[in-house]
Amino acid sequence: MKRIFLFIVTNLAILVMLSITLRLLGVDRILDAEGSGLNFNALLVLSAVIGFGGSLISLAMSKWSAKHMTGATVIEIPSNSTEGWLVETVRRQAKAAGVGMPEVAIYDSPDINAFATGMNRNNALVAVSSGLLQKMSRDEAEAVLAHEVSHIANGDMVTLALIQGVVNTFVIFLSRIIGHVIDRAVFRTEEGHGPAYFVTSLVAQLVLGILATIIVMWFSRQREFRADAGSAQLSGRNKMVAALRRLQQEYEPSHLPDKIAAFGISGQKSQIGRLFMSHPPLEERIQALQSA
């Protein structure tokens, strides 16, 4: 909760600074001169409620939605040696990382993957695919589990959710500002909002949304490097390198839903470019581990 509180305070401070900056630049005076009647403070609050609200609700529901989207089955009582090893390995790593014991689950999928999700460090979920258990050795699987436990220990779910909330707020706020400016200054709408406002706001939101995605994906890639380093500490660098090598050899397109793909061990290859990848290329991750 401390992490959430600090991030919210920081992000609200950023929004206040944005409002002050726009006022110092005279944007509010320009809009007033054009008769827009735009209330900066009300727009900021509305943008923050929508931007942060959606992100935090998604975070709060992350465990429930992840289980339902993947069909993951939580291991309540291990029914075989593999499940017993899985639970005990996560328990040992969670204790070493200083986090509460997460729920451990298995979901049916042929690809080698795993993910972690949850609202906080002491109420999380670690899930692995059936394909991972079938195709990886115990050492490799141990490294993958350590990677996911490191995501939990680093608070990555909360961090990315709040970053997403910030960029959502900026996108909503700035797209409406742009819509007002174009509608009043260019199309000379005198009262209310003309068609230009809605069209311009929509286009601006799409363009800014793309830029926002690039920012969020950059943060996601940095968190992957940190989780790899955390795995190296918990399970050993050689095991983590071996796990990444196995991913290179056995690569299959990820079957994880987009909402939780950022926390899978195996990222999806992007045809558009690296800017939109949630995970760094596997070779770069291996090089980072070997040079550490």
UniProtKB/Swiss-Prot annotation:
GO molecular function annotations of the record: metalloendopeptidase activity; zinc ion binding
Leading EC class: hydrolase
Binding site for Zn(2+): 147, 151, 224
Membrane topology: Multi-pass membrane protein
Keywords: Cell inner membrane, Cell membrane, Hydrolase, Membrane, Metal-binding, Metalloprotease, Protease, Transmembrane, Transmembrane helix, Zinc
NCBIfam families: PRK05457.1
Name of the gene: htpX
Cofactor binding note from Swiss-Prot or TrEMBL: Binds 1 zinc ion per subunit.
Cofactor: Zn(2+)
Pfam families referenced in this protein's UniProt entry, alphabetically: Peptidase_M48
One GO term (biological process): proteolysis
Domain of life: Bacteria
Signal peptide positions (record): none
Main location: membrane
Keyword Cell membrane: yes
A Gene Ontology cellular-component term: plasma membrane
Membership in a protein family: Belongs to the peptidase M48B family.
Protein name: Protease HtpX homolog
Compartments it resides in: Cell inner membrane
Gene3D superfamilies linked to this entry: Metalloproteases ('zincins'), catalytic domain
TM annotation in the entry: 4-24, 42-62, 158-178, 198-218
Active site (UniProt): 148
The species this protein was found in: Nitrosomonas eutropha (strain DSM 101675 / C91 / Nm57)
InterPro entries: HtpX_protease (IPR050083), Pept_M48_protease_HtpX (IPR022919), Peptidase_M48 (IPR001915)
EC number: 3.4.24.-
